[in-house]
Structures are given as C-alpha cells and as structure tokens.
C-alpha cells in the first residue's frame, strides 16, 4: 500500500483561489474603465494625480513598516488600491500635495496605526478624503465642468439638485456615461465605467452582491418616497464608486449576510439624509464611514448561531 503524505496542522484550513495580492489586482482591473474615462475627459493631470497618490501610498507603507521593523508588504498591492481610490475621490483641480498628504494620512494613520492590512476599522481612502475635506475644503470642493470643447467651472449635479435648480441639471445619459461633460471627482464621473468594474468584481467573487445592490436600492426607494428621480441619485456623485469599491472593504464591512444587508441599508439612508437635509450635497463618504464604525455592533447581533450550542440560564438567587 502506498503511503499517504499528510500534513497535520491546526485550524483554520483555508482553501481559497484568491490571495490578498490577486484580490487587490482584480480591484485594480475593475477600476481601469473609470481610470480610462478620467484620462480621456480630464487629460494627463488626472493620470498624474493617480500616480502621485499610488507612489505616496506605497512609499508611506514601506517607510512605516521599515520603521516599525515589520515585514514590508507592498507587494500585496493593497497600498496601490488605496492610492487609486484616494485619487478617485479628489477633484481634478486639486494640487499635487493634496494627494501626498491624503496618502500619508490614509496609510500611516488609518491603516498602519491600527495594525496594518485587515485591522483598519474604517476605509482608509474615505477617511483621508474626510480629513482633506475638513482641512482644505476649498481645494476639495472646487469641481470642474469640462465639456470636450470648452472648460467652465460650475456646481455639481448634487449641488444643483439640492438648490432646486433642476433646469440646469445635465441629462441622465451624460451623468451615466460621464463622457459629455464632467461633474465631480476624478473617479466618480462615469457611473457606467464603475458599474462595469463592480459587476466584474461580483463575477469574480471578490465582493458580495448584497452591499452594492441593497445600497443602490435603498437610495432609489428613498428618492421615490420624497418625489425625486432615483436614477439621478444613483448615477451622480460618489454612489457608484462607494457602492462597489468603498462600502465593500473587507476590513470595515460586515461578513455576515444579515449584517451586510443592515449595513447597506444604513449606508443608503444616511447618504440620502445628508444629501437632502444636510449642509453638504454629498453624503456617500460620511455614510460609509459612519457604518464602518457601526460594523462591530452589527456583527455582534447578526453573527450566525453555532449549531448545538445553547445558552445556559443562570439560576435566580434566592
């Protein structure tokens, strides 16, 4: 009889087709359509901002890990993803140093200070965006509208919608494709490109369908209830970017099915409340960050029951 070569080791025994590097590489592939649209419409400066954020993120991670005498793990591509997502959250008018400061904050403070990859309790790119918006609101709210034939500065569709100036709104098709005019940050101008990337991630099994689907449905239903166009709310601003690439962050979102549904509903509700009743026209970033903070509580109450285990009731004291 042939001898079997068996390896004895402690659990958990994980057999997965995806490594951390392959997951991050798939996310980058999914972001390429939106990056291509940004480069086509905005020009080389959009690509330069992305490169600045990526280089700053990777360099910061390497330096911090070196200082802490930890293994340098920049080859897992997670810092690259953070850099791209941060750049996608910047307006085209942002100076280069905004990208550098945001990248350092995202990696050094939000990620490495809490233990590194998988230990951050909020999304690093969104936390950096919130930090930059609070510190330099002028640079972070200067949004350009750039038709392919001219360049003009104007308000975003969400600002127009909030002000009730619906007559000045671009067409839904323009908002969906992002090709006939630019409204918003670098990576959020084309809902179509982001949708293609998001569907790719779902197809590859990188993200669950629950969070983006429930998030978008919540926004659509809320918009219908208040008499507004649900399509406009879904394809404008950072909703598509947030739904597929931000809210689905492994470290800061629930892992249970029930938890993901509650989390996504919360993201959608807070997004619409801020958009319609808050002082800022866009609520996507803050909604996801708030639900990131609520994730441990959500998981506590939605964790799966262990089969065969029952709670023992304590006897009442006499």
Swiss-Prot record:
Keywords: Cell membrane, Electron transport, Flavoprotein, FMN, Membrane, NAD, Phosphoprotein, Translocase, Transmembrane, Transmembrane helix, Transport. It is a multi-pass membrane protein. Its EC number is 7.2.1.2. The modification FMN phosphoryl threonine is found at residue 156. It is found in: Cell membrane. One of its GO terms (biological process) is electron transport chain. The chain crosses the membrane at residues 35-55, 77-99, 114-134, 182-202, 206-226, 261-281. Its cofactor is FMN. It catalyses: 2 reduced [2Fe-2S]-[ferredoxin] + Na(+)(in) + NAD(+) + H(+) = 2 oxidized [2Fe-2S]-[ferredoxin] + Na(+)(out) + NADH. InterPro entries: NqrB/RnfD, RnfD_bac. GO terms for cellular component: plasma membrane. Pfam families: NQR2_RnfD_RnfE. It comes from the Bacteria. Belongs to the NqrB/RnfD family. The complex is composed of six subunits: RnfA, RnfB, RnfC, RnfD, RnfE and RnfG. NCBIfam families: rnfD (TIGR01946). Part of a membrane-bound complex that couples electron transfer with translocation of ions across the membrane. Couples electron transfer from reduced ferredoxin to NAD(+) with electrogenic movement of Na(+) out of the cell. Involved in caffeate respiration. This is Na(+)-translocating ferredoxin:NAD(+) oxidoreductase complex subunit D. It comes from Acetobacterium woodii (strain ATCC 29683 / DSM 1030 / JCM 2381 / KCTC 1655 / WB1).
